[in-house]
Amino acid sequence: MILVIDVGNTNCTVGVYEKQKLLKHWRMTTDRHRTSDELGMTVLNFFSYANLTPSDIQGIIISSVVPPIMHAMETMCVRYFNIRPLIVGPGIKTGLNVKVDNPREIGSDRIVNAVAASEEYGTPIIVVDFGTATTFCYIDELGAYQGGAIAPGIMISTEALYNRAAKLPRVDIAESNQIIGKSTVSSMQAGIFYGFVGQCEGIIAEMKKQSNSNPVVVATGGLARMITEKSSAVDILDPFLTLKGLELLYRRNKPTTEK
């Protein structure tokens, strides 16, 4: 079995794979102040609930967009699993031809998603990740990562609206069936929801136009289902795309990461 860990700005997603099959997965809040012991106890609690033990794990791979938490994460892996994890970053074999100005600037989550999407669904393809930021990545018909777009995520935008507009309340993010709200709350929810549906469709349409291609569009991320259910621009919803990519990258780099 291998342990895959995706460290995002808001949440960390943890998964256990055996023979390319996702057996278990969990989510915990990303807290850059957590110690390695706190992280270890949290993961061991997940394992206990699933009747797993640290000795079941032969390898670990981590993707992170939160550098301050990485020392604690790596220490946790060594202390509680006796494994030095593979870190997604410079030097890892991805199989991607990255054609951007500075490849080191690209978030590891975007690379992981691109690897998984290309392998699972073919190319050309657009990957939309609804996370803390909403990211759009384009991989061309030759499998080259050509770049993409980054926009504020739904939660960031919602919090900004509440924090910067004195008379507007904090609202839950929810699907809205009516674009014409009858109250302040319903109007905000309609604006947020349909605004992001429109953003998603607009950026995808412009990417297709500028790339002169007709790529498959796959969406992932915590809020992907809510948005994509209202949008015809997305072809595939894959909530485990990032975990799939981590498992695939582990296999591609396995000889240097085995226990």
Curated annotation (Swiss-Prot):
Top-level taxon: Bacteria
Main location, first listed in the record: cytoplasm
One cellular component (GO) term of this entry: cytoplasm
Pfam families given in the database record: Pan_kinase
Pathway in which this enzyme or protein is active: Cofactor biosynthesis; coenzyme A biosynthesis; CoA from (R)-pantothenate: step 1/5
A biological-process GO annotation: coenzyme A biosynthetic process
Positions that bind ATP: 6-13, 132
Listed SUPFAM superfamilies: Actin-like ATPase domain
Cofactor note: A monovalent cation. Ammonium or potassium.
Intracellular or extracellular location(s): Cytoplasm
Binding-site residues, substrate: 107-110, 184
Molecular function terms, GO-annotated: ATP binding; metal ion binding; pantothenate kinase activity
Catalytic function, reaction form: (R)-pantothenate + ATP = (R)-4'-phosphopantothenate + ADP + H(+)
Residues binding K(+), per UniProt: 129
CDD domains: ASKHA_NBD_PanK-III (cd24015)
EC number: 2.7.1.33
Family stated for the protein in its record: Belongs to the type III pantothenate kinase family.
PANTHER family per the UniProt record, alphabetical: TYPE III PANTOTHENATE KINASE
Subunit note: Homodimer.
Function as written in the Swiss-Prot or TrEMBL entry: Catalyzes the phosphorylation of pantothenate (Pan), the first step in CoA biosynthesis.
NCBIfam families: baf (TIGR00671), PRK13318.1-1 (NF009843), PRK13318.1-5 (NF009847), PRK13318.1-6 (NF009848), PRK13321.1 (NF009855)
Stated name of the protein: Type III pantothenate kinase
